[in-house]
Amino acid sequence: MADPVLQSPKNSHFFQPLLPGFDSYLNIPVKFFSKRIQGRNEGRTVELRTDASEKTWQVKIQGRRLTVGWKEFASAHDFRVGDIIVFRHEGSLVFHVTALGPSCCEIQYVPSCNNQENISNLSMKQSIKTELESSLDEDKVNMGKFPRKKHVKKRIPEAEAKSFSSDKSCFVAHVTDSNLREDTLFLPRKFDRSDGLIKGSNKIVLMNEEARTWTLILKFRNSSRTFYMRGGWTSFSMSMGLNLEIPSRLN
């Protein structure tokens, strides 16, 4: 009987972090492409949909690259370097796209009754480059862009800022050559204190969006007074495609 944890989900996903130059094209991961798309994409286009509007975007696919139309799609949705773009396969060459900011939270867009009408009138050759805080004149030129919601942060005293954390149920893991080589990841002290971890040798389970799990050993190092997990961190990182340069959030 097949392991249910390893079975393909009903709607498969892939994600890509945006690096400098991302607006030229976007690469589909090799494994996803060979399993889901290869052989059905020659001379065709993919359909991209988002929750920002009801518009369906037509983007040309050349090999593993999303090319003609990608720049307009990315610009209209105000994608930026450091964002993580999640593609949910809806069947055939149709994808639902969700954008996450550098904090791994879903990007929210300012609702507008005029957005749908404006975006439908965009030429595929238009490039929209203004920010949410652009001037009125620039806004007239760039009608059709979905502006991000502007988050206002409260000022807090410097002493409080050092210990401030908006969400103690998660932490940002920095993937490095050394922790991959040693198959070990140390947990931040703020996280292990808030989560009530028990000293000793325990097990910790990591789960991805597709419900696949990895069981690692959780230990406490007395010399540094920190928890760490090992015995599967490297395997988890490789399977998830975690990047050495992009911080990854663990909940």
Curated annotation (Swiss-Prot):
The keyword Cell division appears for this protein: no
One annotated GO molecular function: DNA binding
Keywords recorded for this protein, A-Z: DNA-binding, Nucleus, Repeat, Transcription, Transcription regulation
Subcellular location: Nucleus
SUPFAM superfamilies tied to this protein: DNA-binding pseudobarrel domain (SSF101936)
CDD domains for this protein: B3_DNA
Gene Ontology annotations for the cellular component aspect, listed alphabetically: nucleus
Keyword Transcription set for record: yes
DNA-binding region coordinates: 11-103, 170-251
UniProt xrefs under PANTHER family: B3 DOMAIN-CONTAINING PROTEIN REM-LIKE 3-RELATED
Protein's UniProt name: B3 domain-containing protein REM7
Provenance organism: Arabidopsis thaliana
Organism taxonomic ancestry: Eukaryota, Viridiplantae, Streptophyta, Embryophyta, Tracheophyta
Originating gene: REM7
